[in-house]
Amino acid sequence: MNIFGTDGVRGRANVYPMDPITVLRLGMAIGLEARKVGTQVVLGKDTRISGYMVESALVSGLVAMGVNVGLLGPMPTAAIATLVRNLRASMGVVISASHNSYLDNGVKIFDSEGIKIPLELEEVLESNVRAELSSDLAQVRGMGKVYRIAGAVGRYIEFVKGTFPKRLKLSGMKIVVDCANGAAYHIGGEVFWELGADVVVIGNKPDGLNINHNCGSLHPEGMVQKVLEEGADIGIALDGDADRVVVCDEKGRLVDGDQVIASIMRHLRATKSITDAAVTTMSSKSIDSYARELGVRLHRSEVGDRHLVDTMRQHSCSVGGEKSGHIILWEHSTTSDSLVAALQILSIMLLENKSASSIFGDFVPMPRVHRDIPYSMEFDHIARLIGPTLSDVEQALGRVNGRVIFRRSGTERLIRCVIEGEDPKLVALVADELSIKLRELGVENGVEPEMQ
């Protein structure tokens, strides 16, 4: 069984592959590769209670291989990608399961350039996790040391603020920030406050168990309510490791990643020579025609931050992102950074002198239903059983420029099912029929329905 998915290693804490023995061996495997480049690895995490166990196991494996480990404590994933470059480290490691509940944890790995390691290196690490590495252990004199990196939070805050135009301030703007009780709990509000905003922060009291629980980008209802209560100009919701952002405008209307990307594309096209952008297969079909109207070439990648980055590098894209809220601004970041993306949105509002609802109003996503379906039987078996029904669905949706996506998640035991098309009634009907068929096949009903 492979331990790497679409975004590193992820699973139930204290259960393979996130059990202490496997994580220790993963630390050794990472150390074996890191020492080919240098002697330092920087290590950050989110706020899950299992982070202590995972951190200890990884550190033991790394120092046993002769690698020094700089501990960052709770920090956004993008902060590790930034600091690995800033500190000239060999690799950066993040302990996080992103938007998952506290029950899960994971490990993400960046190379010395702050880019997620390629599939080929994942395969090497996977092989070495299973290999006998005792002969590769460092001699006692050569074992690594562990130290805390002082000032890392302030250094990252200054980096994020540096992506905001120097002539602009957030004075007079009221912002609600939901930090999801996660890695940015002590950073999210500070960034906007230091730039002059009146900031209302929620989801900033982590206890190890409440990360992403009824808060953050997956549960933005609290943010929406607070925006309306406070009369705020905008609401910004992060996830557990602050690599995705979901926004609501001053009217409390939610804005997804596609709308954020569309707004940034439009602004950059009007002010800069942006020619190319990237999204994943999960993005709305209507964003393709929107990009064409702007004169921007839009490229699609497979789902996942690494695939998106590869596509952006291949086509020299200025901006890329996913519907889920992962936004990459290549001028500033090598991975998705919710705080950098949020500042980009705020700068557009200020430079265009428009409200949040106005800057997102141009792009209208195609009507869709998105369901996340838990499953227990083998996915390939489900795919074979549902195949004929999917063919019928695709034929029906083809009449309304629609499509169906039926894929397994690379980070959770869920099937991602998306039905979209220009006729919202047909989309809803097809989604219901597909759900009925899945129930007949013994697959659980979908959760978290989304209609746009």
UniProtKB/Swiss-Prot annotation:
GO molecular function, one term: magnesium ion binding
GO CC annotations, alphabetized: cytosol
InterPro entries cross-referenced by the UniProt entry: A-D-PHexomutase_a/b/a-I, A-D-PHexomutase_a/b/a-I/II/III, A-D-PHexomutase_a/b/a-II, A-D-PHexomutase_a/b/a-III, A-D-PHexomutase_C, A-D-PHexomutase_C_sf, Alpha-D-phosphohexomutase_SF, GlmM_bact
Top-level taxonomic group: Bacteria
Keyword flag Metal-binding: yes
Cofactor(s) listed: Mg(2+)
Metal-binding among keywords: yes
Cofactor binding notes: Binds 1 Mg(2+) ion per subunit.
One record GO biological process: UDP-N-acetylglucosamine biosynthetic process
Record field: catalytic activity: alpha-D-glucosamine 1-phosphate = D-glucosamine 6-phosphate
UniProt PTM comment: Activated by phosphorylation.
Record's function text: Catalyzes the conversion of glucosamine-6-phosphate to glucosamine-1-phosphate.
Entry similarity comment: Belongs to the phosphohexose mutase family.
Protein name: Phosphoglucosamine mutase
Enzyme active site: S98 (phosphoserine intermediate)
